[in-house]
């Protein structure tokens, strides 16, 4: 064994061994319990960063731990490879997105391999591979046939910098989630997936996901946003139609005094009288340019315009002026709000500003509200007033009664509404999966026949950064023949949102080379669902919601038998340096390559796992990295020093051990127990590593390492350290295991079990309190009888002075921990 630890030599040796022997190749094996471990796959941006190192190290610990426990582990890796950055890089470097992407994949694959991550590289996939995206086109066509994919004109979020559409979930504080540019509203024909068909199931199944963080589930439930209420028809005064309203507050219907419409409402301009036409048109234009998030904010300055038209309150028969209001959104309910200013604060502020009538219909029991003196809306529970036959009822009861009344009278109906909107997947970019449809002047939208798939991205597109979608300018791609009528037609030039590719990749990993369809159902059933998924919480209502939706769709299409893709979810924290998330713009990035070159991959892994629990943010510390490196050197030196002595040691005979040797063995088995629990039950890798560090200290402090009767205990202790470290620092541990004389690798050795008898302390320390204050301590046997411990405590020399002249009222014993004496 070399005296000095040389990380590069150790890592090169064992990474070569694992690659040569395909050590982490997963095969279906019904005789073993499966475990599917997956981290969210990366975008091939060019280089891995410390966030990647941490995320993938966390996953690798779990994968290696499960293998050592005997599980059949699937741990794949791939690349979320379509997307705008590749196109932007092509413009900047005058190259092609494919070249940039595949070069980055090759480089980042090499980086990941240097970390010693236990991936089954035979299952590697990239979403830009034709062999991947062609099957996605097949899935699209099946969704189209089922009515789950459709095209329509609608107001969309438009990023002027990326020159593409964004889904609602991709707009953050009014800006593009990718480039941070202000988002505009634009009317476009676009393709969408009918995720709303699955809204109720997506909501219901969140209550089955017991292995997910509650925070993520709450975010999804809020995004889906189920609300129950009524749809109510308000006839136009002109008699030429009606306005349909969804409300959850039908109990306030008698207090509705005006109507508010979203600027995007299809009737908005039609309702404008000749005198109001110009003002209404200008208002519509202004509001459409305003960010939706700002329009929904409580502190928004309320603005509106009178259309010149009126509708009729169907229960009071009073005229209600119809306004357009900047705070009403078209994507909630029907885009029309019955305004009840006395019982809704936004309506109250609007009514005060535009001098609109107020009518109280709910008031506190025993009190009378005067609209003339109200300074804010009354939104609490109360008693119904000014509401006809419903007067005197509690408003909660009146909700149901009024809903029944509306249905009976044919004025409205009970209904359920969801905040969730269909997923717009059209993107006006080249580097994405082509949507497999053809636009024909005679036949309209025509699906590409399955026999003509795949629709392949042309490689001769030009990337100038101007003129929108490069794909639309490739005549050889866009010009085609209609498969129905045979006339010249135009191929769809929108590509799919990259979140489509990441919505089913975890299923494709089960059979990545399958050539007869998107998924091999038998293999999907063998591996799915993913047992542990790991990724950032920023994907709570993007990727994680879409992946759940897609899994349910593929189930209904017959491709799989699972309802939910991920049984357990871990959302890891960020890597922080100098008080901020690492980023190039902040100049606080640590290059993993430089770190690995100086300290080795295992030090990088150890620090990222030891510095904080996985779900918490990790504060970068150069001293912490040094400390991790020093610890590995200490363990290496320990093995080097004891190896000549323990080389031929046999099994431990607990009955022949002296007191100090028993103490060391107890520490060994307590550590095995703690590390096992910390890794398996809590993923508290930091405390697990700390426990191993304490064990190393105990071994080094054991003075009789050389004594013949102790060599077996020392060998057991040292080997336990190596086995416990194996998931965290695999290259390092594998080499020490080899040096300890083992012919097989650590996975074959398995995870160590602990001796239950060995972890029992021969003595425990019991503290003694008098009237709640610590006064002394006792050392007793762990199974000591209560009477004996109480007697010892009362007879303790340090306790006696506190008892003299006092009446002992109570003595309470908490076994193995505490004696509490109460005196007066």
Swiss-Prot record:
The record ties this protein, via Pfam families, to:
Anticodon_1, tRNA-synt_1, tRNA-synt_1_2, tRNA-synt_1g
One function term, GO molecular function aspect:
aminoacyl-tRNA deacylase activity
For the biological process aspect of GO, one term held by this record is: leucyl-tRNA aminoacylation
Q: Where is this motif: 'HIGH' region?
A: 42-52
Q: What class of enzyme is it?
A: ligase
Might you give the EC number(s) for this enzyme? 6.1.1.4
Q: Where is this motif: 'KMSKS' region?
A: 581-585
Q: What is this protein called?
A: Leucine--tRNA ligase
Family annotation (PANTHER family): LEUCINE--TRNA LIGASE, MITOCHONDRIAL, LEUCYL-TRNA SYNTHETASE
